[in-house]
Amino acid sequence: MNHARRKLVKFSLGSLAATALPAWSVSIRAQQPTVSIIDAGGSNVVVCDTADGLVLVDSGTPTYASTLVDQLRAVGNGRVHTLFNTHWHHDNCGANELIGDSGAAIVAHQKTWQRLATQYYVPHEQRYVEPLPETARPTVKFAGKGSLQVGAETIDYGALVLPHTDGDIYVHFRNANVLVVGGAVTPPELDPELDWYGGGWLGGRAQSLDTLLALADDATLIVPAAGRTLTKAELSTERDMTHELYQRLNKLIRSGCSATCMADEGALEGLGRRWQDPQRFLYAAYKGLWAHHYNLAPDIL
């Protein structure tokens, strides 16, 4: 983000329109009457204001943690009621510790709790990521579905099947009609991120996009972990592209194709998408497909 040109944005949430609110030093991506989507260092943070406190989905990058939390204190009653983590990558959990220290509940997939509580390796960066402090880790863990009522807002949430990592979830603000999808969805301007070492793979992404599409209607605001918001029509296009790509790569890997071979065979052509780093994406997709070879075909080996 260009700090020199970043625009300071004032915004209001629902009934707080008459209340003095801070000039945010993070950009507002989109707003609904009770929900704002904030770009906190390249990572989207969703803020829902209710009479019982704020509900957040993800907490931005560590660099923006203090700024984000300081400015949240000026919204509504200034208290974070609940924080959801859509997955365990640290660039989406940056303010977890500060928010957890304030007494907020942190809700996440069981696998996210496990990942945040232990050291894990990032192969493409050749480094280990240390566990987060205990107060930064989820206090409510699940592996299926759940629902939460905070103020007047009904919030449904559920696990997704390995679209990005092994700990992905969605969060659906039913009344506001905002569906937060984390790393399971990527706007077409960005390449899909498949953390193959962390469990994410293309088949899981295709299945998860089916799940998410069934939750949305034509008015739903769909919020990924990074980048702009999407419509249901755009999500449908992403789903169709992902299923087509899965079929192509499945066929190629069964024929003995490597990631480089997939590129040479034009696996990414004609999909209506401009790829930023096609070789990197194909490598991650290839590794993920091999990790899940038992789901491809009985003769894969």
Sequence positions of predicted segments:
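Accessory terminal helices/loops
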Residues: 15-16, 20, 25, 213-221, ...
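Conserved beta-strand hairpin/beta-sheet module of binuclear metal-dependent hydrolase folds
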Residues: 31-71, 171-173, 177-183
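Active-site metal-binding motif and surrounding structural segment of the metallo-beta-lactamase
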Residues: 63-107
